[in-house]
Every structure is written in structure tokens, then in C-alpha cells.
Amino acid sequence: LKTYSLDWDIDDPIFNFNLLGFNSYISKDYDFVFYLNKNCNFNFKRVNDQQIIENGITYVFSIFRFFLEKTEQKIELISNFSYPQIIINDNNSFFDKIEKVKILIPEYNYFNYFLKSDSLLDDEFYINLENLKKICKFNKINIDKIKIKNLENLILPT
């Protein structure tokens, strides 16, 4: 199996996007998407998951996508936490199964979800977010503070 490596620069156009982090009381991705769709007039749909392989373990992150016609931009909602993976130990320990979860962007591990967009959303969206009771916190994220290898996790298949 051949492995290829890409060298990125933070100024690469592929990293030209806005990122908003959400900390929510809603832990299930589909419930959170339903909540955003209902309260923010979005129409997110589930698309292929983001898969990251690390040390032979495949971690899966949910992705939802929506095309906002008004501004002609693609908006993606990405889970910051993978689905739990059950790892079976073969070293005869007392605990032979371990549940592992990977964080997509460890620099912002306090956010459950990320909203990735081509450009800034309108002010009405942010005002609406402030009134949503099930969102504890949301912040625009400076992607310059994210390590390149973690930024690569946000390059999603189209």
C-alpha cells in the first residue's frame, strides 16, 4: 500500500474558508443538525463521513452539507468528535476492549461541532445563534492557530 504525503502552506487557497465552533448541549449530530435546520432556516443533509486513519484505526466524523442560495456558498457542519471505535486488546489484560474517540481539531477540543463556510454568514444568522438556548457557546475560529496536519482534516471530499 503506497502512502502519499502532501506539503501544505497556510496561505494555500484550499484553506480559504471561515470556521465557526459550537459548544452545544446536544450531543447527537443528527439532533444538532435538526435543531440548526429548524432554527436557522438551513437545510443540512448528511453526506459521506470524513474518515481519518491513524495507527491502523479508522475514525469516522459526521458531515452535513447545505448550499445557501442567497450567498451562493457551500456550508458544512462537521463533528469534532469521531464515533467511538471499539479496539480489542490482545495482550490478555483485564480490559480487553477499549473505546477510542479522536478529536478532529484538538486545539479546539471544547467545541462539539464546526461550521465551515466559504465566506462569512450574514449578521442575522449570528443574532439568531445568540438566542438559541441549546448552544452554550459559539466562536469564529482563527485557522492560523490550527496545526497544518489538523487543518488537513477539514479538507472534505466534494
Give short role names for the model-derived ranges:
Residues 9-27:
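Terminal, regulation- and interaction-focused segments at domain boundaries
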Residues 51-98:
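Surface-exposed, low-hydrophobicity interaction/linker segments
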